Amino acid sequence: MAQMSTSEIRGGVKVEVEAQPYTIISNEFVKPGKGQAFNRIKMKHLLTGRVIERTFKSGEKLNLADVAEEEMRMLYKESDGVIFMDEKSFEQIKISLESIGETVQWLLDDHVYEVIFYNGNAVNVEPPTFMEMVITDTSPGVRGDTASGRVLKPAILESGAKVQVPIFVEQGEKIKVDTRTGEYVSRVSS
């Protein structure tokens, strides 16, 4: 099995820790005044979506997880899962909402996503880093809002995701959102 040093691991790398698959969120190198340097690694479990933080000795080797990523088109949502289709073979698979976790808020019909397979089973979905979506509901910006220091307001996107947007953005506008953080990035000109 392939291995990678903790000092080389970056965000997005898939590793196996205690025979469980994780995707790395962040890797922080720490050099204390006394003692050995170590890496504080934040990672998300691929099967449960739970985020944990572990420390490893600097230079320690971690096994790379045996995962495959395939681009698949989302067809539709059901009450207990989401149906995806492989555009090459037209094979359809269903991934449970439990496996997808919070990523479900970024899923739109007829869009392409990275589906992650672990030991031959579809276990998770990764949306693109940035997505363009239409705002379906938000309150109008009221004159004087910025005087009170309020420069953001809540908005609901076409996928159902809730994000904070600047007060000048209105309902029906298309915006660019960072799916990793759920933050507004910019307006999208039509």
Swiss-Prot record:
CDD domains: S1_EF-P_repeat_1 (cd04470), S1_EF-P_repeat_2 (cd05794). Keywords: Cytoplasm, Elongation factor, Protein biosynthesis. It is found in: Cytoplasm. GO terms for cellular component: cytoplasm. The keyword Transmembrane helix does not apply. One of its GO terms (biological process) is peptide biosynthetic process. Pathway: Protein biosynthesis; polypeptide chain elongation. One of its GO terms (molecular function) is translation elongation factor activity. SMART domains: EFP, Elong-fact-P_C. The keyword Cytoplasm applies. Pfam families: EFP, EFP_N, Elong-fact-P_C. PANTHER family: ELONGATION FACTOR P, ELONGATION FACTOR P (EF-P) FAMILY PROTEIN. Involved in peptide bond synthesis. Stimulates efficient translation and peptide-bond synthesis on native or reconstituted 70S ribosomes in vitro. Probably functions indirectly by altering the affinity of the ribosome for aminoacyl-tRNA, thus increasing their reactivity as acceptors for peptidyl transferase. Belongs to the elongation factor P family. This is Elongation factor P 2. It comes from Protochlamydia amoebophila (strain UWE25).
